[in-house]
Amino acid sequence: MRVIAWTPELTIGIADMDESHRVMVDAMQHVSHIGDEGFEAAYRNFIACVERDFREEEEVMELFPYPDARTHCEHHARTLSALHHSMGQVMQGDIASGRQALALLFQWFTVHIATIDRGLALARIAP
């Protein structure tokens, strides 16, 4: 499985969000290396980390006029829905579904930061 690593390209220029994203990358790395025995608990903790990150981003969106807030929140909601669905499968013993969701999230996360989150950062610093 390809493992995401923190790189300078993932920074968006909002210190709190960059740190939150770095924490999420660390959490992705951690859960991707966990064996099947500990995967369920690690994956549950990872999903909580994603929920926290999204909640914090959505709080930032409320602080200033951000025209793409609704779309951005919808991206978060769809992603969380998929993660919760895969968590249900993991709880039934289908660890492979959780690992597959994690692999897809690696790809989604880098694109989300480069496009949607970077747009949020630009809107925040716009005059």
Model-identified regions with their sequence ranges:
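Small-residue-biased structural context
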Residues: 1-127
